[in-house]
C-alpha cells in the first residue's frame, strides 16, 4: 500500500438506504455465537464510551435501536442489525475499559479480535476515535490488526461538536496513517448535531452488493 493524502468522502448520500428501518437480529457473547450472514457487514469499533451505539442510532434514525449508556463497558456483546436486507450493521463491545474483571476484559478482546480477523462478510470497519481524546495506543493496535488481516477501514472522529480546533486532530490522523502506510477516509461526526452523518451514510452505502 502507498501513503496518500487523507481522503474526505464526497460521494452521493446514502439517505435512501437509511430511510429503511434497521432491526436487531442477533447478539454474540462468545465466538461460537457469531452468526454467518450472506449480506455485507459493516462494523463499528472503538474505545468504551466513544459513542458507537449513539452513532448507529443516529444514522439509522432510531434512538432506541442500539442500547446507549453513559457508563463505559455497557455493550458486552457483539450486536448485529439488519438494514433493509442490504447491510448488516455490527456494534462491537468497546475496548480499553478497565473497571471490569481481567477475565471479562480478556473475553471481550478475544471476541472483538476473532470477529475482525475471521468474519467472511465484513466489508468495512469504522474505527471510532473520541475527538476530545485523540488516537490512543489501543486504537493503533486495532488499526494494525485490521491491516494485518487486510481489512478496509476508515477513521471516524466522534463527538465533533465538542472540539473547535481540528488542526491537531488532522495532523495526528495524517501522521498515524503515514506510519501505517495506509490511506483512508477520515470523517468528523456528531450524534448531537448530526454533522458528518450524510457522508458516513454514503460511505456505508458503497458496501452494498451490486444488483445483477
UniProtKB/Swiss-Prot annotation:
Classification via Gene3D superfamilies: P-loop containing nucleotide triphosphate hydrolases (3.40.50.300)
Requisite cofactors: Mg(2+)
Residues at which GTP binds: 46-53, 73-77, 91-94, 158-161, 189-191
Record-listed Mg(2+) binding positions: 53, 75
UniProt GO BP: division septum assembly
Domain of life of the source: Bacteria
Entry annotated with the keyword GTP-binding: yes
CDD domains: YihA_EngB
Record key words, sorted: Cell cycle, Cell division, GTP-binding, Magnesium, Metal-binding, Nucleotide-binding, Septation
Classification via InterPro entries: G_ENGB_dom (IPR030393), GTP-bd (IPR006073), GTP-bd_ribosome_bio_YsxC (IPR019987), P-loop_NTPase (IPR027417)
GO molecular function, one term: metal ion binding
Segments forming domain EngB-type G: 38-210
Task performed by this protein: Necessary for normal cell division and for the maintenance of normal septation.
UniProt family annotation: Belongs to the TRAFAC class TrmE-Era-EngA-EngB-Septin-like GTPase superfamily. EngB GTPase family.
Protein name, entry field: Probable GTP-binding protein EngB
Gene name of this polypeptide: engB
Amino acid at each position: 500500500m502507498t501513503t496518500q493524502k487523507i481522503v474526505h468522502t464526497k460521494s452521493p448520500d446514502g439517505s435512501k438506504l437509511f430511510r429503511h428501518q434497521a432491526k436487531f437480529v442477533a447478539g454474540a457473547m462468545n465466538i461460537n455465537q457469531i452468526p454467518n450472514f450472506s449480506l455485507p457487514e459493516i462494523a463499528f469499533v472503538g474505545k468504551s464510551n466513544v459513542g458507537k451505539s449513539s452513532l448507529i442510532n443516529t444514522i439509522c434514525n432510531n434512538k432506541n435501536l442500539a442500547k446507549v449508556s453513559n457508563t463505559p463497558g455497557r455493550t458486552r456483546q457483539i450486536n448485529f442489525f439488519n438494514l433493509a436486507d442490504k447491510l448488516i450493521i455490527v456494534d462491537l463491545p468497546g475496548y480499553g475499559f478497565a473497571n471490569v474483571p481481567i477475565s471479562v476484559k480478556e473475553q471481550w478482546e478475544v471476541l472483538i479480535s476473532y470477529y475482525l480477523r475471521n468474519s467472511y462478510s465484513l466489508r468495512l470497519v469504522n474505527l471510532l476515535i473520541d475527538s476530545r481524546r485523540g488516537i490512543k495506543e489501543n486504537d493503533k493496535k486495532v488499526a494494525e490488526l485490521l491491516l494485518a488481516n487486510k481489512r478496509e477501514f476508515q477513521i471516524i472522529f466522534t463527538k465533533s461538536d465538542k472540539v473547535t480546533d481540528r488542526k491537531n486532530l488532522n495532523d495526528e490522523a495524517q501522521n498515524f496513517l503515514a506510519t501505517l502506510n495506509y490511506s483512508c477516509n477520515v470523517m468528523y461526526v456528531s450524534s448531537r448535531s448530526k454533522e458528518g452523518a450524510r457522508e458516513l451514510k454514503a460511505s456505508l452505502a458503497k458496501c452494498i452488493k451490486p444488483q445483477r
